[in-house]
């Protein structure tokens, strides 16, 4: 499996969508019998690795550190949980080296809930990823929240059957991660701060770059591909689709229902919420409220109802990003790659 397959997969999807729109056809239901290739999905194929994140669209993935938190997330309506050793806020406060969560904890979470379970690995740490794949997690996050083992090289995700999610601050970073095999992108934001400002900035940068890309000529897109260090087919595909060719979630500092709705309004396909839920004093109510606001983001009345479900007095204590030193910023980790 390689990059050409991901391009072919999305071009065929785009062509099918174009044809249906031209013919005025709306697919309300599928055939009684699916083609054999679709009836028996093969683990590790492009269709499975790219298809799994699509089922998370419109939902919330919640960071958890134990079985109890995973149960709260599932009851609140999360589409998946992300298991890690410490919440990003605690990682920031503790300092030192942040590593993959205990395998036993991940397995306990997997056996206690029915929704998908994701887990984080350090940037460039192939063997943490191989361990997670071997125990059967549904997705791996190669995350800057943990301490990178390689600042210049991310994991070659084409070597794995399990899908990966990576963070990005710009279109260039997002396309480089996709070229490496990422099946999902998330804005980096500034995790563990309870401040959504950086997530907003990163989402606007990515969406703005895509908008400008659509107005470029073929020669100009080739120049952009060289500048980004990615295959020109990926740049062309992104321009044609008018969006990233993989699912794009927002993350980093989301702490309230209004934060989640804002990120969806800016173009996110869903949201990751880390410290915002379980560092608050009302985690159960906040989790349910953020799920409601994310799924009903285009209805201000529904988002207002979600906001009524929480109290600002119980929100996590946020961190002013402007007061962080360059060494304290998590978003810059792995940025050289």
UniProtKB/Swiss-Prot annotation:
Reactions catalysed: aldehydo-D-ribose 5-phosphate + D-glyceraldehyde 3-phosphate + L-glutamine = pyridoxal 5'-phosphate + L-glutamate + phosphate + 3 H2O + H(+)
InterPro entries the UniProt entry points to = Aldolase_TIM, PdxS/SNZ, PdxS/SNZ_N, RibuloseP-bd_barrel
Q: Which residues hold D-glyceraldehyde 3-phosphate?
A: 204
* Pfam families cross-referenced by the UniProt entry: SOR_SNZ
| PROSITE patterns on file | PDXS_SNZ_1, PDXS_SNZ_2
So what EC number does this one have? 4.3.3.6
Q: Which domain of life is it from?
A: Archaea
The protein's UniProt keywords, in alphabetical order, are: Lyase, Pyridoxal phosphate, Schiff base
Residue runs in coiled coils: none
List residues binding D-ribose 5-phosphate.
Answer: 63, 192, 253, 274-275
Q: Which GO terms describe its molecular function?
A: pyridoxal 5'-phosphate synthase (glutamine hydrolysing) activity
Q: What metabolic or biological pathway is this protein involved in?
A: Cofactor biosynthesis; pyridoxal 5'-phosphate biosynthesis
Top class in the EC scheme: lyase
What does the entry give for GO biological process? amino acid metabolic process; pyridoxal phosphate biosynthetic process; pyridoxine biosynthetic process
Spell out the catalytic residues: 120 (schiff-base intermediate with d-ribose 5-phosphate)
Q: What does this protein do?
A: Catalyzes the formation of pyridoxal 5'-phosphate from ribose 5-phosphate (RBP), glyceraldehyde 3-phosphate (G3P) and ammonia. The ammonia is provided by the PdxT subunit. Can also use ribulose 5-phosphate and dihydroxyacetone phosphate as substrates, resulting from enzyme-catalyzed isomerization of RBP and G3P, respectively.
What do we know about how this protein assembles, alone or with others?
In the presence of PdxT, forms a dodecamer of heterodimers.
Record's PANTHER family?
A: PYRIDOXAL 5'-PHOSPHATE SYNTHASE SUBUNIT SNZ1-RELATED (PTHR31829:SF0)
| Similarity comment | Belongs to the PdxS/SNZ family.
The protein here is known as Pyridoxal 5'-phosphate synthase subunit PdxS
């Amino acid at each position: 499996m390689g990059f050409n397959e991901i391009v072919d997969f999305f071009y065929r999807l785009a062509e099918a969508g174009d044809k249906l729109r031209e013919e005025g056809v709306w697919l309300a239901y599928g055939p009684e019998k699916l083609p054999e290739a679709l009836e028996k999905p093969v683990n590790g194929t492009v269709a499975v690795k790219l298809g799994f994140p699509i089922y998370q669209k419109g939902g919330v993935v919640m960071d958890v550190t134990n079985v109890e938190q995973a149960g709260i997330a599932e009851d609140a309506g999360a589409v998946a949980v992300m298991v890690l050793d410490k919440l990003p806020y605690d990682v920031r406060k503790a300092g030192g080296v942040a590593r993959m969560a205990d395998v036993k904890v991940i397995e306990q979470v997997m056996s206690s809930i029915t929704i998908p379970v994701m887990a984080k690995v350090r940037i460039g740490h192939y063997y943490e990823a191989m361990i997670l794949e071997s125990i059967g997690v549904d997705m791996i996050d190669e995350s800057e929240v943990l301490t990178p083992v390689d600042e210049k090289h991310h994991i070659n995700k084409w070597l794995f059957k399990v899908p990966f999610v990576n963070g990005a601050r710009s279109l260039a970073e997002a396309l480089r991660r996709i070229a490496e095999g990422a099946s999902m992108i998330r804005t980096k934001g500034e995790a563990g701060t309870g401040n959504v400002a950086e997530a907003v900035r990163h989402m606007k940068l990515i969406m703005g770059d895509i908008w400008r890309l659509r107005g470029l000529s073929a020669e100009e897109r080739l120049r952009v591909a060289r500048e980004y260090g990615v295959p020109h087919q990926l740049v062309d595909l992104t321009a044609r689709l008018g969006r990233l060719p993989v699912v794009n979630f927002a993350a980093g500092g989301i702490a309230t229902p209004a934060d989640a709705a804002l990120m969806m309004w800016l173009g996110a396909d869903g949201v990751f919420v880390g410290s915002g839920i379980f560092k608050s004093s009302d985690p159960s109510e906040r989790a349910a409220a953020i799920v409601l606001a994310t799924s009903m983001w285009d209805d201000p009345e529904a988002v207002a109802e979600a906001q009524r479900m929480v109290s600002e007095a119980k929100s996590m204590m946020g961190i002013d990003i402007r007061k962080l030193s360059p060494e304290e910023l998590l978003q810059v980790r792995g940025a050289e790659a």
